[in-house]
Amino acid sequence: MSAEVSTTPAADNVNGTPEATNAAATSAPEVTAVESSSPTSPNNNNQPHSASLYVGELDPSVTEAMLYELFSSIGQVASIRVCRDAVTRRSLGYAYVNYNNTADGERALEDLNYTLIKGKPCRIMWSQRDPALRKTGQGNVFIKNLDSAIDNKALHDTFAAFGNILSCKVAQDEFGNSKGYGFVHYETAEAANNAIKHVNGMLLNDKKVFVGHHISKKDRQSKFDEMKANFTNIYIKNIDPDVTEEEFRKIFEQFGEITSATLSRDPEGKSRGFGFVNYSTHESAQAAVDEMHDKEVKTQKLYVGRAQKKHEREEELRKQYEAARLEKASKYQGVNLYVKNLTDDVDDEKLRELFGPYGTITSAKVMRDSTPAERTETPDSEKEKEVNKENEKKEDEEKAAEEKPKESDEEKKDETKKSDKKLLGKSKGFGFVCFSSPDEASKAVTEMNQRMVNGKPLYVALAQRKDVRRSQLEASIQARNTIRQQQAAAAAGMPQPYMQPAVFYGPGQQGFIPAGQRGGMPFAPQPGMVMGIPGGRPGQYPGPFPGQQGGRGMGPNQQMPPNFQGIPMGAMQGPGGIPNGMGYPQAMGQVQFGRGGGRGQVPGMPMGQGMRGPGYQGRGGPQGGPRPQGGRGQNAAAQPAAGREEAPAGALTAQALNAAAPPQQKQMLGEALYPKIQAQQPELAGKITGMLLEMDNTELLGLLEDDDALRAKVDEALSVYDEYMKNKGEGEAPADADKPKEAAKETATEENKS
């Protein structure tokens, strides 16, 4: 992740004092002697050119103020920067401290290294900006098999006797515990060789340590591949627990000289069923693998193979899992269906019965909670339980009095099934059905999607992986945001082309958008400026269009832009092709509000040259005079004003619906449904519309597209309403549409109970 970094002084100024400079880097500079990169720093003779220190191993809560309080005790601090993540602004655990002179930096490195800050010892070293010097492995020493009690300071004190240390670090896990290995970066290669010569094989805290030159990961990988090809250590599992160490060694001695053989045992001394054998030559190990793999020893078939390290096994298992996952995904591509909106009483068998007619089902599963659902007890259910208990007591007495034969196997199986069903958790309302072929799956989607099952319409679609669903969701959210922006622009009172301000284009330049332009009237035309519209070079219309200097307005045969359909021609014709001051807002008002849309002059906009007062309808039109009714000009009779036409009910799309706010979605659906329902039931159209609006928005969109389904829903709502009226009586007519809705809910509840 990206981070902000304050770097070291770059160069000396005239007075010889280095200047602190700031820069940005994408990651923490690896100046530590770590496994992934092996930095090098110049010797002390070159250090006066830099007075910047790297401070690592910091607690995430450490701030610049805390560091300033500590490092200012040494000398005057030029700047301090704690490096943070560019997005979350959380500390990355390291910082840079820039002093005004190098002597203060040297004193801070000597006195403050491994000082406790917020309970954690900090690690200080000279900062090195040159990555080429940081990543050379010269002088870097690797130490393993360290005792857990050895920390950075103890390691530094141990190896400081062999030369000047630039960096020293013990690797730790996420909990701060030592991983048992570390790195010491010396100033010179001679010091590193001296440390390896004297410390390798010695005891540190009663543990024999290995000390050697650090090998980069790339070189280690090539060496590791060579070791894999010439292995001598083999792993054996599925060993019979009765096999002893002597028997185990004797089984594998026939293939060559064994340097070591061991059986793994638990703390109680019992065999854990696996062991290791190490041969002196690769040929012997390979022969043992070839001969003993899958061979039975004391009725146990052995597994014999090359011994692997833990990280190697984990990587291999990860690859196997990924390959199996991809194979499974390709195998079930187009045949696995996702079904939701299931009622609680639908189980695996019921789901299989529903989709069985469409093909061969390989699996059907209803997803359930991990724990059984607790039934809510009502007074009625408590009474039923008491009655059931009394009946059970009577039955037990009768069974005790009469000797009955043992239950048959079938009865036991039935009871087992019932007990299993009781242990099942509550249904999550969705499941999966897998067919044997894609054709059967597509047929099931076509037939079963939106089908009513137990009073609820099913949603059936092809199952998708989580990452695919996430990408589709992100795309839909982005499209929804785009629609919202377009609707907000339309609400400002301008067609889309005029929503974009005028853009200036210099020779060979992309142009700029003037700041402060809000929705409404466009900029007055100026030389070198064209009106902004989508497509090609933004804001350019083909041919002379209003807004170009010296133009005469729109020609009589010129095609109008898409969003100008419905605007009176007089509103776009005036001297110089400039939209008239009053005609243009009135035309916009007619487009948005239909009759009476004329709004007059925009408040606060002065009447400039080329703009006319009320009633002006283009070049040569009358000025002044009474305005006709409805706010239209005198040309309105000759040219019918294109008011906003009623959109057909079926024009409502899911994309437009999702772009609206949740409270407005039901209103939009109601406005689209009402005309269709009114055509079928003029008297009860309002009540039926209100009843249908209780359904999900996706189902309502489906009804708008399917007249047969809508007719069936209207008939169903009528039957519910008629039943409600019969129960209430003709004299108690409902006062509003809420009562039939309640009746519909009561009827649905009774149907579910039955």
Curated annotation (Swiss-Prot):
UniProt entry keywords in alphabetical sequence: Cytoplasm, mRNA processing, mRNA transport, Nucleus, Repeat, RNA-binding, Translation regulation, Transport
Q: Does the record bear RNA-binding in its keywords?
A: yes
According to its UniProt record, where is this protein located? Cytoplasm; Nucleus
Checking NCBIfam families in the record gives:
PABP-1234
Q: Where is the composition biased (Gly residues)?
A: 610-633
Q: Which family does it belong to?
A: Belongs to the polyadenylate-binding protein type-1 family.
Segments of skewed composition (Basic and acidic residues): 366-420
Which intervals carry biased composition (Low complexity)? 36-46, 634-648
The UniProt annotation puts the region (Disordered) at 1-52, 365-420, 595-648, 729-754
- Please provide the Gene Ontology terms (biological process) for this protein: mRNA processing; mRNA transport; regulation of translation
- Polar residues compositional bias: what residue ranges? 1-25
InterPro entries attached here? Nucleotide-bd_a/b_plait_sf, PABP-dom, PABP_1234, PABP_HYD_C, PABP_RRM1, RBD_domain_sf, RRM2_I_PABPs, RRM_dom
Q: What's the protein called, per UniProt?
A: Polyadenylate-binding protein, cytoplasmic and nuclear
Domain named PABC: which ranges? Answer: 649-726
Predominant place of localization: cytoplasm
Provide the RRM domain boundaries: 51-129, 139-216, 232-309, 335-465
GO molecular function of the protein, one example?
Answer: RNA binding
Organism of origin: Aspergillus clavatus (strain ATCC 1007 / CBS 513.65 / DSM 816 / NCTC 3887 / NRRL 1 / QM 1276 / 107)
Give the GO cellular component terms, alphabetically.
Answer: cytoplasm; nucleus
